[in-house]
Amino acid sequence: MNLLIPAAGIGRRMGGSRNKLLLTLLGKSLLSWTLEAAVKSDHITWIGIIGQPIDFPDFQKNISDLSTDKHIELIEGGATRQESVYNGLQALPSAAERVLIHDGARCLATPELLDRCAVEILKCPGIIASVPVKDTIKVVDPSGIIQDTPNRRNLWAAQTPQGFDVKLLKECHKKGQILGWEVTDDAALFEKCGLPVKILEGEETNLKVTTPLDLKIAEFILLKAL
């Protein structure tokens, strides 16, 4: 299975100007934790890290610290996550039929989750790891007045990995470019093209490290697991 890791983001909500995936968590970068899970996965054989060239020396050091014979490639990203994933799709091996896409900032994803996603994507054109929403969600108008309270049983919080048929996802990206779609994940492109995306239950601990508080929570979770 092929895995693309978007890793081009700047951690502005972290209060810094550097790539947040280079921040340290228990002595290792966030990217290193993500890569370790990918390397331990039984199904992942090819890994592409999508980032900016300025970060490549640091990424290469993270790769060098790993003990693996899996192919890991550095791919230049774009101005947005959407553009970066598109670049990653072009860099996939020519024989690639399926791909998993996993945010590098979700550094607590387990090898088991990656493997479950790798198996499930062979059965359908699109999958997304998600967890049931526990909070009551309110839909509000621009002035902050509640308009609706959706049934919580129908709500899932999207995570990654997300998995797709490579040919279909490339077509969705091209259509999105032509029509000017701006989306925050690849499942949304599939949805806009009328293609099915199946929910696969993710992991409660698979949080996205976005703020300093997230970093503290991730540290707590790792200390409990080690």
Curated annotation (Swiss-Prot):
The keyword Protein biosynthesis does not apply. Pathway: Isoprenoid biosynthesis; isopentenyl diphosphate biosynthesis via DXP pathway; isopentenyl diphosphate from 1-deoxy-D-xylulose 5-phosphate: step 2/6. GO terms for biological process: isopentenyl diphosphate biosynthetic process, methylerythritol 4-phosphate pathway. The record marks R152, K208 as: Positions MEP for the nucleophilic attack. SUPFAM superfamilies: Nucleotide-diphospho-sugar transferases (SSF53448). InterPro entries: IspD, IspD/TarI, IspD/TarI_cytidylyltransf_bact, ISPD_synthase_CS, Nucleotide-diphossugar_trans. One of its GO terms (molecular function) is 2-C-methyl-D-erythritol 4-phosphate cytidylyltransferase activity. PROSITE patterns: ISPD. It is an enzyme of class 2 (transferase). Its EC number is 2.7.7.60. The record marks R13, K20 as: Transition state stabilizer. Keywords: Isoprene biosynthesis, Nucleotidyltransferase, Transferase. It catalyses: 2-C-methyl-D-erythritol 4-phosphate + CTP + H(+) = 4-CDP-2-C-methyl-D-erythritol + diphosphate. Belongs to the IspD/TarI cytidylyltransferase family. IspD subfamily. Catalyzes the formation of 4-diphosphocytidyl-2-C-methyl-D-erythritol from CTP and 2-C-methyl-D-erythritol 4-phosphate (MEP). This is 2-C-methyl-D-erythritol 4-phosphate cytidylyltransferase. It comes from Trichodesmium erythraeum (strain IMS101).
